[in-house]
Amino acid sequence: MAATEGVGESAPGGEPGQPEQPPPPPPPPPAQQPQEEEMAAEAGEAAASPMDDGFLSLDSPTYVLYRDRAEWADIDPVPQNDGPSPVVQIIYSEKFRDVYDYFRAVLQRDERSERAFKLTRDAIELNAANYTVWHFRRVLLRSLQKDLQEEMNYIIAIIEEQPKNYQVWHHRRVLVEWLKDPSQELEFIADILNQDAKNYHAWQHRQWVIQEFRLWDNELQYVDQLLKEDVRNNSVWNQRHFVISNTTGYSDRAVLEREVQYTLEMIKLVPHNESAWNYLKGILQDRGLSRYPNLLNQLLDLQPSHSSPYLIAFLVDIYEDMLENQCDNKEDILNKALELCEILAKEKDTIRKEYWRYIGRSLQSKHSRESDIPASV
């Protein structure tokens, strides 16, 4: 029976037993040379972990299985139930089975204790993607009134090791909600994005923080900086759309013109950048591609020196929009669109030639005068 956050007081099971007495200390080692002392200190630092409160790593040679610990003798472990006839059963390590058998036991008892809290840490070290462990850890954080700033330090280390794990980012989000303090978030996320600027978990968290705490100031400047570093980063173009949509919007003609010209300048830098073309289409499509003043002429001027499949496809979209809006020179516009579809099929986007020929046939079928449609169509 899974525990839920904020349900009840401490469950039966009592407080953990007394820890085992440590063995007598070994005799002092022989004197070390300065270099040896430095190496030993570095090794000690490497073995330490965030929130080091007596936690013993699963990789430690002195690690003791839970089933062999006196303070856990009152708990009957709960094995994983894979059903009567498991297929392709996972072969877990002895440590993994031991930790999760005891985790299932404390979860079943809804035991809100310090030992249960430490157990979640072992379980997370073995599988940080287990959302049930994270959920129960949050239950214990509240029940035991743990220091949430210490927990933030802990989750920072986990995210740095596993930056593309849904559960660790969700845990951080809950902590920020509880603390009502986003002061570390934008800088922390920027550090993660410096390692991988397309980490959508980090972007999702950034969007939530900005929207939840109204941190819109300077975000567009941050986006500009990242686009200068990598104009092809679709995640950053998406962030640009997110920021403007939630602040000024695109209804203001000055904002829209600024964004159109900004995007065209980025396209001039890298003509074959699909991300920029998608952004341009996204901000104009609902307003009518053919209705934006002078856009068609600007793209036609770009075509000789900055031609790409995306530019030609965009021209097809503009011509189609003109046909849909009953332009005066319908036959001429249709012929231009059909010619571009054939250029895409034969030269610029040959891998999708059948798609572009289908688009051409569709345009011809829809917008040709009935007497002009070939019998085969």
Swiss-Prot record:
Residue runs in coiled coils: none
PTM field: Phosphorylated. Phosphorylation is mediated by MUSK upon AGRIN stimulation and results in the activation of FNTA.
Biological process per Gene Ontology, one example term: positive regulation of Rac protein signal transduction
Listed Pro residues bias regions: 19-32
Keyword hit for Transferase: yes
GO molecular function: acetyltransferase activator activity; alpha-tubulin binding; CAAX-protein geranylgeranyltransferase activity; enzyme binding; microtubule binding; molecular adaptor activity; protein farnesyltransferase activity; protein geranylgeranyltransferase activity
Modulation of this protein's activity: Activated by the AGRIN-induced phosphorylation which is mediated by MUSK.
Catalysis: reaction(s): L-cysteinyl-[protein] + (2E,6E)-farnesyl diphosphate = S-(2E,6E)-farnesyl-L-cysteinyl-[protein] + diphosphate; geranylgeranyl diphosphate + L-cysteinyl-[protein] = S-geranylgeranyl-L-cysteinyl-[protein] + diphosphate
Entry-linked InterPro entries: Prenyl_trans_a
Keyword entries, A-Z: Acetylation, Magnesium, Prenyltransferase, Repeat, Transferase
Pfam (any one): PPTA
Keyword Acetylation: yes
Cofactor(s) this protein cannot do without: Mg(2+)
GO cellular component: CAAX-protein geranylgeranyltransferase complex; cytoplasm; microtubule associated complex; protein farnesyltransferase complex
EC number(s) on file: 2.5.1.58, 2.5.1.59
Annotated Gene3D superfamilies: Protein prenylyltransferase
Sites of N-acetylalanine modification: 2
Disordered: region residues: 1-55
PFTA repeats (start-end): 112-146, 147-181, 182-214, 215-249, 255-289
Similarity section: Belongs to the protein prenyltransferase subunit alpha family.
Protein task: Essential subunit of both the farnesyltransferase and the geranylgeranyltransferase complex. Contributes to the transfer of a farnesyl or geranylgeranyl moiety from farnesyl or geranylgeranyl diphosphate to a cysteine at the fourth position from the C-terminus of several proteins having the C-terminal sequence Cys-aliphatic-aliphatic-X. May positively regulate neuromuscular junction development downstream of MUSK via its function in RAC1 prenylation and activation.
Subunit structure: Heterodimer of FNTA and FNTB (farnesyltransferase). Heterodimer of FNTA and PGGT1B (geranylgeranyltransferase).
Name of protein: Protein farnesyltransferase/geranylgeranyltransferase type-1 subunit alpha
Organism from which the protein derives: Rattus norvegicus
Lineage summary: Eukaryota, Metazoa, Chordata, Craniata, Vertebrata
